[in-house]
From Swiss-Prot:
Coiled coil: none annotated. One of its GO terms (biological process) is coenzyme A biosynthetic process. The gene is coaA. SUPFAM superfamilies: P-loop containing nucleoside triphosphate hydrolases. The keyword Nucleotide-binding applies. This is Pantothenate kinase. Gene3D superfamilies: P-loop containing nucleotide triphosphate hydrolases.
């Protein structure tokens, strides 16, 4: 039987930290410590060294790839004799709950927007495309929130299709982690960006994963470059529990929070509840739906202890 390592060796070029860091070349570090502090996720210790060693080489790679796509578009439009439509380059970032997808997305947005070739970089999370809380309850999906069936896929695909087509003023629904629900009558307007980053649990899912066996368009069909943020499950579970404890004294303390009833839990109670949530929801979703899509990514960022990147895999 072919091992996972041999599959990775066939599909990907592997780089350790020092090898990857060398590929930065002369790309300058444009972030300072206060700016980085605003981009960090809960319970993450992201340093400027991590940005320099991991994210600057990735920023350089993406800039080269986006530039090549833009040049190809110019050639095609010249051949067709048409005015080039403004269509964004779409980057997706997938991975488990608590792996740090949102931080990766924010860092890349900040770095990519510094390149003169593509100054406008928008970021959208798929959380806004979860069915509203009332609809999840009606469908009996509240305990499967984050699973593929808990998303309004028709709305999500229509959104990314309109963005990819170069349409102006495309609306993306917003999500509140306080109310644990989609925000009514509010949205993020996407106005023909140079690059769109879309971040979510299931953005690498394809028609092959359809439960009904019918081929249909998915987010991955519209993506130009995909990134998967990876880590061992024991680390993911630990990070989830640590984050839950942080939220208990932070967001959960807000009386409007859907999880306010967790705010006064003792440490042991909070850890037990968080572990149960992982074992019953997040862990199964990871194994069934998220992790199986990993090897579809163009690039895999593998994290080790303390959220530090240990290896980068780049598809050949």
């Amino acid at each position: 039987m072919t091992s996972e390592n041999s599959i990775h060796n066939a599909l990907y070029l592997g780089f350790n930290r020092s090898q990857w860091a060398e590929l930065r070349e002369s790309v300058p570090l444009t972030l300072n410590e206060p700016e980085l502090a605003d981009l960090r996720g809960i319970n993450e210790k992201l340093s400027l060294t991590e940005v320099t060693d991991i994210y600057l080489p990735l920023s350089r790679l993406l800039n080269l790839i986006v530039g090549a796509k833009q040049k190809r578009g110019l050639v095609l439009n010249e051949f067709l004799g048409r005015k080039p439509p403004k269509r964004p380059y779409i980057i997706s970032i997938a991975g488990s709950v608590a792996v740090g997808k949102s931080t990766t997305a924010r860092i890349l947005q900040a770095l990519l927007s510094q390149w003169p070739e593509h100054p406008r970089v928008d970021l959208v999370t798929t959380d806004g495309f979860l069915y509203p809380l009332a609809e999840l309850k009606r469908r009996g999906l509240l305990q499967r929130k984050g699973f593929p069936e808990s998303y309004d896929m028709k709305m999500l695909v229509e959104f990314i299709s309109n963005v990819k087509a170069g349409n102006e003023h495309v609306k993306s629904p917003l999500y509140s982690h306080i109310s644990y629900d989609r925000i009514k009558s509010d949205y993020q307007a996407i106005e023909q960006p140079d690059i769109l980053i879309i971040e979510g649990l299931n953005v690498l899912q394809s028609g092959q994963d359809s439960a009904v066996g019918i081929q249909q368009p998915f987010v991955s069909d519209f993506v130009d470059f995909s990134i998967y943020v990876d880590a061992e499950e024991q680390l993911l579970k630990k990070w989830y529990i640590d984050r839950f404890l942080q939220f208990r004294g932070g967001a959960f303390s807000d009386e409007k929070s859907y999880f306010h009833h967790y705010s006064n839990l003792a440490d042991n109670e909070a850890k037990t509840i968080a572990a149960n949530i992982w074992d019953s929801i997040n862990g199964p979703n990871l194994k069934l739906n998220i992790e199986p899509t990993r090897d579809r990514a163009h690039l895999i960022l593998q994290k080790g202890y303390d959220h530090l990147m240990s290896q980068v895999l780049l598809r050949k």
